[in-house]
From Swiss-Prot:
GO biological process: translation
A single Gene Ontology CC term: ribosome
Protein name: Large ribosomal subunit protein uL23
UniProt keyword terms in alphabetical order: Ribonucleoprotein, Ribosomal protein, RNA-binding, rRNA-binding
SUPFAM superfamilies in the cross-refs: Ribosomal proteins S24e, L23 and L15e
PANTHER family for the chain: 60S RIBOSOMAL PROTEIN L23A (PTHR11620)
Pfam families named among the record's database cross-references: Ribosomal_L23 (PF00276)
Length: 101
């Protein structure tokens, strides 16, 4: 497998997914949840998290999330589909999004 370019890795992670479920998973299983690019793969997500946050990743699970149907005035529209990555960190590793560091 060829090395993944650093430019590509910087485009893979879009944002941390902060929700009630993500907080529960983080506390119970030492996992962090990210919104990722729809074309992202597990090895890319793992490499991007290790590069940006300087932590060791144990495993990555990815799920595709279907966009919701929404009304925009009289018209029915649809939000975009997106991808969610559950990143399991090795014991002793942690990413803190609340602190300003």
């Amino acid at each position: 497998m060829s090395a993944i370019s650093q430019e590509r890795l910087l485009q893979v992670l879009l944002a941390p997914q902060i929700s009630e479920k993500a907080t529960y998973v983080a506390d119970k299983n030492e996992q962090v949840v990210f919104k990722v690019a729809t074309s992202a793969t597990k090895p890319e997500v793992k490499a991007a998290v290790e590069l940006l946050f300087k932590v060791e990743v144990k495993s990555v699970q990815i799920s595709n999330v279907k966009g919701k149907s929404k009304r925009f005035g009289k018209m029915m529209g649809r939000r975009k589909d997106w991808k969610k990555a559950f990143v399991c960190l090795k014991p002793g590793q942690e990413i803190n999004f609340v602190a300003g560091e």
